[in-house]
Amino acid sequence: MKNRLFAAIASLAIIVAGCEAQTPSSAPSNWTVSSGMPPRWPSGLQAAPDAPPRIVRIWLSTLVIAPGSTLDGAIATTTNVASVEVRTAAFSINSLHVAPGQFRFHTRVLELPPLARLHTYTLDVIARNTAGVAQVEQAPLEMK
């Protein structure tokens, strides 16, 4: 019974991993990856409520995570962005809206299933306005 369950889980993990789109090779130019948030951070850019959302700048503490590590981030957007989601195939984070065009998040990485480790995933940062229109930016996120 245990062998069948393990085989089913392993097969499902392989199928899910195979379904993931091409992982980007690097972060876009408006991303900063460093241990501390950049001192000169842009304010939210003014935008009409019905204008398309726009991600101006993204800061992440790292693009390599492991169980027990933390992941911090800040996203500067246009002022019409209602929500920012940070997502991979393994997890999803809803960022805190701290000011017009400003979003932050902090999360501690919990234990990862063995099949999810030692893999590079696509990290999606999704900004949405109130109409649900989205802008997505992607970077590689390595799980150890």
Positions of predicted regions on the chain:
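Bacterial signal peptide processing site
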Residues: 20-22
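Edge beta-strands of extracellular beta-sandwich domains
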Residues: 133-142
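Aromatic sugar-binding surface patches on proteins
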Residues: 99-110
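C-terminal motif of bacterial Sec signal peptides marking the signal peptidase cleavage site
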Residues: 16-18
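Conserved structural position at the C-terminal beta-strand
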Residues: 125-127
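Surface-exposed, short loops/turns at beta-strand junctions within beta-sandwich domains
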Residues: 111-119
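Short proline/glycine-enriched turn/loop motifs at strand-loop junctions of beta-rich domains
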Residues: 76-82
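Short, compositionally biased P/S/T/A/G/V-rich stretches that sit at domain boundaries
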Residues: 24-71, 76
